[in-house]
Amino acid sequence: MSPFRISAFQSQTYQAAVILVVGLLMASTSQAENQKPEEPASFYDPVERNIEGWTIAVDPMLLNEANKEAGEKAMKALANHLQRITYIVPEKQLARLREMRIWLELNNPVLGNMQYHPGKDWLVKNGHDPRLVKHVHIPKAKHLTDRHMWAKHPYVVLHELAHAYHDQILDFNHPEVLAAYNASKEAGIYDEVLLYTGKKVRHYGLNNQMEYFAESTEAYFGVNDFYPFVRAELKEHDPRMYKQLEKIWGPIK
């Protein structure tokens, strides 16, 4: 059998094809080298402060001369929130609660309400600093000194820290909390309750087990904006959840 050979025509065609491919590769490489990568979003580096045992990531704008007074007022108000938590939460649970980090901003242009960020995906998708993950986030420092906020939600920082504790220490699907939440929904005990304004409304805690836990924690340790407002009312209105909070947070004497 004669050996396999490439004809002169085939050889010329092959060489031309190789030259064309090499040329395309060189052009593609050159284009890739010249193409500027997308610049990542620019985020400030917060300054760490310790307030009442909590690590606070502080927006540097709150520390400059122009906003010094606003920054001092905000941190003083935040200290007030954290002091009230310190004086009521048992030491063992308090030590874990202090592991929950807080991020304080002067004036976030997009976000308003205080919130907790359990995951990074939402932050990245919406153009926010991914370092906010697992932080209690106070987007607007002025809310800490807002009279309406104190009238409505005097334990708002505890509420957000309860979310962090639920996520990082317990688990959002903690079986006993979830069971108490589902039982309260089935019983309809939160379908129409008194709001701090005197109106009758659907309880905010019915949104999900996370809000149910945070709202109940406010009533257990302090004052909530929805009935049951305080610990004795929670014990009477939702005894099953009250018992779970005693197990989770420790009894209050």
Task: Map each language-model feature to its residues.
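N-terminal secretory signal peptides that target proteins for export/translocation
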Residues: 1-13
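Bacterial N-terminal signal peptides
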Residues: 16-27
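Boundary at the C-terminal end of the N-terminal hydrophobic targeting segment
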Residues: 30-34
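Disordered inhibitory propeptide/activation segment of secreted metzincin zinc metalloprotease zymogens
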Residues: 36-51
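Acidic/histidine-rich, surface-exposed loop or edge segments in extracytoplasmic proteins
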Residues: 49-72
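Structural recognition of the beta-strand scaffold that forms the well-ordered cores
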Residues: 57, 101-103, 137, 164, ...
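Acidic/His-rich structured neighborhood in mature extracellular/periplasmic domains
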Residues: 72-186, 242
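Metalloprotease/metallohydrolase-associated module, dominated by Zn2+-dependent proteases
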Residues: 125-136, 143, 147, 181-253
